[in-house]
Amino acid sequence: MIWHVQNENFILDSTRIFMKAFHLLLFDGSFIFPECILIFGLILLLMIDSTSDQKDIPWLYFISSTSLVMSITALLFRWREEPMISFSGNFQTNNFNEIFQFLILLCSTLCIPLSVEYIECTEMAIAEFLLFVLTATLGGMFLCGANDLITIFVAPECFSLCSYLLSGYTKKDVRSNEATTKYLLMGGASSSILVHGFSWLYGSSGGEIELQEIVNGLINTQMYNSPGISIALIFITVGIGFKLSPAPSHQWTPDVYEGSPTPVVAFLSVTSKVAASASATRIFDIPFYFSSNEWHLLLEILAILSMILGNLIAITQTSMKRMLAYSSIGQIGYVIIGIIVGDSNGGYASMITYMLFYISMNLGTFACIVLFGLRTGTDNIRDYAGLYTKDPFLALSLALCLLSLGGLPPLAGFFGKLHLFWCGWQAGLYFLVSIGLLTSVVSIYYYLKIIKLLMTGRNQEITPHVRNYRRSPLRSNNSIELSMIVCVIASTIPGISMNPIIAIAQDTLF
């Protein structure tokens, strides 16, 4: 009898929870319509994978790409709508969040064709790979719109879990297993540190979890200048630092870049930084509004360390992927300048613009590396010597992307850095901008060193990998080359296109 009553109570409670969730989805679902499209795409992928054979593999790519394109379309149709808070304050929809969601969707859309040929050659499980990519994209999108501490913690965990699985996808590779283990352990530690910082913020605000309500709670409790807030700031900065991978939170980055499959590295190298930048901007700007001097100082230290260490250590690397890992550490130092400048001097607009260019530059470089790796089986920088004599198109594409990463005019990277540094200079960050300029010159050195190898014609310097290099047939690798061409064109956009891009970015500020 007691068991029967308990069972009835359990059913009633479950029904209430289900009805409440259905009510939220029914009335608030329109606010997450782009995310719902991805969820529907995930369900379709699962159904097709569980009920069909290998002949339906093209459908898996088609559904994944279509879901991402439809999600981008839904975001664009929702452009310039009034900011809205939904799901009981857990999620906020505004133009600022949506432009970061657009960047994440753009990264994923370019990464899927980039990975098609690689997956087929390495005989990796295709359906699971696409599921993890879409789920990580979904987690990144929710992180961009997260409006409370719980969602800010759960969303990146969704992204991180998929990242761990993707980085260890080649289970038979010892380097991949080592990278995944290191990534998982450091990711778990950083999540614990982040939650500990949230607990200090939660307690100091009188039990508030929504970002704006935390500010009101700190005012009511008079704790906005307390030691507890300083402790929360330090722990949260360290936790977010793992996602952004600035120095000194960068130890996992080179190993994960080197050990993971190259398309996975391309995906993680941009999406994680875009999502973490969106989250960091909102966390520092809203709950820590009264501690702006403190978090400005912390971020300045991280930016300086990242720009110096990332670019100096990149010079010594012999692996192309490890070199790009340290290069990305230096690049995030430039992005942090935009976060520090903030809304007052166009810092956010310059950060968003540089992020857009960084996506094209980085993914274009990785597309070239994927193609070269599939045709030669090597990642060593020395093995790129003389590539221009065998494949001028690939060598020229790689050279343009590297020059754009270095910031040489008239490529897109130059104008992105120019606007970012100019905003920092106007904000009075003279020392930070000077470090950025000097380290940009250093980065140009090691990029030009690679380009010199690409263009060399000396037989004694050309390795057997390039001597035996054979271009694939015209119809092969076309998906990778499509992504590469799109990224190369975007990386070489002249400065005349900067003004409309910056104007659009400025309209997204909250």
Curated annotation (Swiss-Prot):
**From its record, what is one biological process in GO terms?**
photosynthesis, light reaction
Q: Where are the transmembrane segments?
A: 24-44, 57-77, 99-119, 124-144, 149-169, 183-203, 227-247, 295-315, 323-343, 354-374, 395-415, 418-438, 484-504
Q: How does this protein lie in the membrane?
A: Multi-pass membrane protein
Coarse class of the protein's main subcellular location: plastid
Q: Where in the cell is it found?
A: Plastid, Chloroplast thylakoid membrane
As its record notes, the protein acts as a catalyst of: a plastoquinone + NADH + (n+1) H(+)(in) = a plastoquinol + NAD(+) + n H(+)(out); a plastoquinone + NADPH + (n+1) H(+)(in) = a plastoquinol + NADP(+) + n H(+)(out)
What EC number(s) has UniProt assigned to this enzyme?
7.1.1.-
Q: Does Translocase appear among the keywords? A: yes
Q: What keywords appear on the UniProt entry?
A: Chloroplast, Membrane, NAD, NADP, Plastid, Plastoquinone, Quinone, Thylakoid, Translocase, Transmembrane, Transmembrane helix, Transport
Top-level taxonomic group: Eukaryota
CC per GO annotation: chloroplast thylakoid membrane
Which GO molecular function, any one, fits this protein according to its record? NADH dehydrogenase (ubiquinone) activity
Q: Name one Pfam family in it.
A: Ndh2_N
The subunit structure is: NDH is composed of at least 16 different subunits, 5 of which are encoded in the nucleus.
- Entry similarity comment: Belongs to the complex I subunit 2 family.
* PANTHER family associated with the record: NADH DEHYDROGENASE
Q: What does this protein do?
A: NDH shuttles electrons from NAD(P)H:plastoquinone, via FMN and iron-sulfur (Fe-S) centers, to quinones in the photosynthetic chain and possibly in a chloroplast respiratory chain. The immediate electron acceptor for the enzyme in this species is believed to be plastoquinone. Couples the redox reaction to proton translocation, and thus conserves the redox energy in a proton gradient.
Q: Which HAMAP family match?
A: NDH1_NuoN_1
Q: What is this protein called?
A: NAD(P)H-quinone oxidoreductase subunit 2 A, chloroplastic
Q: Which organism is it from?
A: Gossypium hirsutum (Upland cotton)
Task: Cite the source lineage.
Answer: Eukaryota, Viridiplantae, Streptophyta, Embryophyta, Tracheophyta
